[in-house]
Curated annotation (Swiss-Prot):
Record key words, sorted: Chloroplast, mRNA processing, Plastid, RNA-binding, tRNA processing
Membership in a protein family: Belongs to the intron maturase 2 family. MatK subfamily.
InterPro entries referenced in this protein's UniProt entry, alphabetically: Domain_X, Maturase_MatK, Maturase_MatK_N
Protein name per Swiss-Prot or TrEMBL: Maturase K
Principal location: plastid
Gene Ontology, cellular component aspect: chloroplast
Pfam families on file: Intron_maturas2, MatK_N
Record flagged with keyword Repressor: no
Compartments, record wording: Plastid, Chloroplast
Gene Ontology BP, a term: RNA splicing
Upper lineage: Eukaryota, Viridiplantae, Streptophyta, Embryophyta, Tracheophyta
Function of the protein: Usually encoded in the trnK tRNA gene intron. Probably assists in splicing its own and other chloroplast group II introns.
Molecular function terms from GO: RNA binding
Keyword Electron transport among record annotations: no
């Protein structure tokens, strides 16, 4: 990283024009496999799957890759032979997949440079905004705002069908023409777009082999559409008073009317758009491929927003967005899945006793409350896919972990359980979370029994029931001085208050699977 920073400081005025030579630098591919870089704010840790190649960068393979990239004849040969799908003419599929993955990861590091240069100064200017990165910081905002709104647009963000759209969007950030040509060649020549993106999923599911590169391309696309969307929203908010002629005060009335007429003449078409979407109670939240657009307005207004979004993606990004990907629902009888929670607005009826002189009477009132619960069935499906239980929720052993030591097995299961408790601490109903913990606990016991070639009962009798005490470290044990326990049972003891932690910067892996499924 220091070498990369030295390169940028050496020629800082032209840093974006000299990104392409970095592709031939060996340290770039070392950075791509560096754990510190992979755990940055941009991406999750990467791994090479299905190739028999570990996460450590091999200098020999990198040097061979750079040598082959220098050979222009083999590059031209590869362009003329699409059916072989071999990087720079290599005939071995192992090296083909491995080379393409190394190139995609290395190029992703290079593409990050313009973005990181924009983000680093802002993080230094606002050091107190660290907690705003927390995923849980979104939910207090939703609790405060959504309970007063009427309708919500549940949006599955569409993805561009053609690769050229992503390359053109990236041109706004990178002016290095050779790098863009190299990216275009890599996308069109060495991969089949239908294999990289699965149309049946809710959003574009990037292959694990090239996750890093394609995620930054997808984020560039999302940033582009949100820039235009937020601009329109801000303009409609700040200029909404220009359409309220009937409510002008009488002081200098005719002068104000003339001023408004001048505005209408200059910006007639744009103001029609602003009036079309006038709504001062509009809130937008997005995470990954899902977004919600909530409004306090009428059904007609929220329907206009839906039509606008469909036309916006069609005319600005030149691809058709299917209307059924955007759902209009009233908050009163609708639940939506977001960030690992099933969220809804509950209506709680209550009666208030009032007294006027000597007469007593009851007044029925309705209060709205934002509610979040743990999705049990999807989480069980996620555990089933991870081989912790069956599809019906019956715990099974984890054979791949049976070769580890007892402490490692308990530590792995315990870490998963504690992370789930930590992430889903904002649930209003903890009973669902207890079922997930029970599955993990019994799966851990069966894995230990499988290792020792025994039964779960004999294992617990021989080692003692306290073997898994550390496995179920409850969240309330940490915050018990603040929130007293509501029950004496250690397995089911939990506070009823919802708690949002500001140290969670990424979604839990089990809940993360739900977001992409």
């Amino acid at each position: 990283m220091e070498e990369l920073q030295g390169y940028l400081e050496k020629d800082g005025s032209r840093q974006q024009n000299f990104l392409y030579p970095l592709i031939f630098q060996e340290y770039i591919y070392t950075l791509a496999h560096d754990h510190g870089l992979n755990s940055s704010i941009f991406y999750e840790p990467m791994e090479i799957v299905g190739l028999g190649y570990d996460n450590k960068s091999s200098s020999v393979l990198v040097k061979r890759l750079i040598t082959r990239m220098y050979q222009q004849n083999s590059l031209i040969y590869s362009m003329n032979d699409f059916n072989q799908n071999r990087f720079v003419g290599h005939n071995n599929s192992f090296y083909s997949n491995l080379d393409s993955q190394m190139v995609s990861e290395g190029f992703a590091v290079i593409v990050e440079i313009p973005f990181s240069l924009r983000l680093v100064p802002s993080s230094e200017e606002i050091p107190k905004s660290q907690n705003l990165r927390s995923i849980h910081s979104i939910f207090p905002f939703l609790e405060d705002k959504l309970s007063h709104l009427n309708y919500v647009l549940d949006i599955l963000i569409p993805y561009p069908i053609h690769l050229e759209i992503l390359v053109q969007i990236l041109q706004c950030w990178i002016q290095d023409v050779p790098s863009l040509h190299f990216l275009r060649l890599f996308l069109h020549e060495f991969h089949n777009w239908n294999n990289l993106i699965t149309p049946t999923k809710s959003i574009s599911v990037f292959s694990k082999e090239n996750k890093r590169l394609f995620r930054i391309l997808y984020n560039s696309y999302v940033s582009e559409y949100e820039f235009v969307f937020v601009f329109l929203r801000k303009q409609s908010y700040y200029l909404r008073s220009t359409s309220s002629r009937a409510f002008l005060e009488r002081t200098h009335f005719y002068v104000k009317i003339e001023h408004l007429i001048d505005i209408d003449v200059c910006h007639n078409h744009f103001q029609k758009i602003l009036w079309f979407f006038k709504d001062s109670f509009m809130h937008y939240v997005r995470y990954k491929g899902k977004a919600i657009l909530a409004s306090r307005g009428t059904y007609l207004l929220i329907k206009k927003w839906k039509c606008y979004l469909v036309n916006f993606w069609q005319y600005n990004f030149h691809f058709w967005s299917k209307p059924y990907r955007i759902h209009i629902n009233p908050f009163s009888n609708y639940s939506f899945y977001f960030l690992g929670y099933i969220s809804s607005v509950l209506i709680n009826p209550s009666a208030v006793k009032n007294q006027m002189l000597e007469n007593f009477y009851l007044v029925d009132t309705l209060t709205q409350k934002f509610d979040t619960i743990v999705p049990v069935i999807p989480l069980i499906g996620s555990l089933s896919k991870a081989k912790f239980c069956t599809i019906l929720g019956h715990p099974i052993s984890k054979p791949i972990w049976a070769e580890l030591s007892d402490s490692d097995i308990i530590d792995r299961f315990g870490r998963i359980c504690r992370n789930l408790s930590h992430y889903h601490s904002g649930s209003s109903k903890k009973q669902s979370l207890y079922r997930i913990k029970y599955i993990l606990r019994l799966s851990c016991a069966r894995t230990l029994a499988r290792k020792h070639k025994s039964t779960v009962r004999n294992l617990l009798q021989r080692l003692g029931s306290g073997l898994l005490e550390e496995f179920f470290t409850e969240e309330e044990q940490v915050i018990s001085p603040i929130f007293p326990k509501t029950t004496l049972f250690p397995l089911h003891g939990s506070h009823k208050e919802r708690i949002w932690y500001l140290d969670i910067i990424r979604i839990n892996d089990l809940a993360n699977y739900l977001d992409w499924s």
